[in-house]
Structures are given as structure tokens and as C-alpha cells.
Amino acid sequence: MFSLQGVKFKDVLDINKLKFSADEITCIVGPSGGGKTTLLKLLNNLVSIDQGQVLYQGQSVEQWDPVELRQKVIMISQQPVTFTATVGEELQSGFKMTCAEVPAEEELVDMMQQMQLNKDLSTAVEVLSGGEKQRLALARSLLLNPEVLLLDEPSSALDQDTEEKVIQQLANYAHHNDITLIMVTHSLNIAQEFGDNIVEIREGKIV
């Protein structure tokens, strides 16, 4: 799936060798400022490395068509960006960008419910809390059926009970649909409970 060799990025990351396996959940842990978010950006070619190789399916991410890569590998930031006025429009936005067929409303609502987001499709995005926007971004991305989801603290704004429910549903959906999850989390409990693999990064290096 992903393979990194001899990767260096400024003074932020220095990774000799790292692989992410397909159809697994990898949790990335470590102190703030250690390079976790930067690693996700490298995987999606949002920033360019100074040295080494980042390969996706055996091909350098820099050689992939950017649009195609980001359809296959979707990244959700800790504070996800929303593009539209209503919840329904937000869930449909990815399909309209690619001219793909938009799912039926029942499918949109079902995905929201799986992510513990019980809102009408007509609800204005601007009235959602930070945690609700995180769940909306997860639902929007899962509907697009990516090969890989890169998640940067996807549940940081949720209470513990809701966080566990959302991550459980996310993990179940990913396993059933062959989606690879690479998730940054500060919660060791989440990493140990849901991660097939755990990668710890400190000061830009794999521990």
C-alpha cells in the first residue's frame, strides 16, 4: 500500500523505513509537534519530501495525478473544511466534484447515523458543533468509498463515549469495505482497542 524509504522533510521528519499495509487500521501516536500530521500530508503529497521516496501502490506519490491520488487517498484534518450550506449538500459535494452519481437520500442518512450524526439533511452546516462537523466529514468521505482514509485526530472534539462509538463504526465500515485507515490519535486507548498496528513518532523519528 504505502512504503517510505529514507524520507526526510526539513527538520520535521526523518524516517528510514515505514510500511502501511492495505485493509488495516494503523494508529499513529506520539507527542504534539512530533511530525504526525506532516506524515499524513506526505502520504497524500500535500507537501514534498526533501529526500527519499514515498510510494503508493509501488509508484511515487509525486508521479500520481493529483486528482486521482486524492480520490483514492482522502485526508480529513482535525478541523475539517466544509464547502456548502446544508448537511445534505455537504454529503453530496464530493460526487458533484467528480460528476459521479449522487447516492439516494436514504444512503446519506444511513451514513450519518453510522457516524452518530442525527441531523436532517436540510440542517445548516454553520450551526453544527466542532464534533458534528468532524462526523459529517467522516460520513462525506466514507460515501466516496476511498481506498485509504488519512485521519488527523478525527474525533478530537467528541466526548469519550461518542468517540468510541464513532471509531467503532468507522473501523467496522472500513473492514467491511476494504478501506485502509491511517489515523493520528492522542488516545492510547483508542489506538490499542482499534489499531491493527501502532506507530509511535517522537521528534520526527519512528520509536
Regions found by a protein language model. Name each.
Residues 52-60, 69:
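Conserved ABC transporter NBD signature motif
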Residues 103-120:
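Conserved ABC ATPase "signature" region
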Residues 149-153:
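Catalytic Walker B motif of ABC-type/P-loop ATPase nucleotide-binding domains
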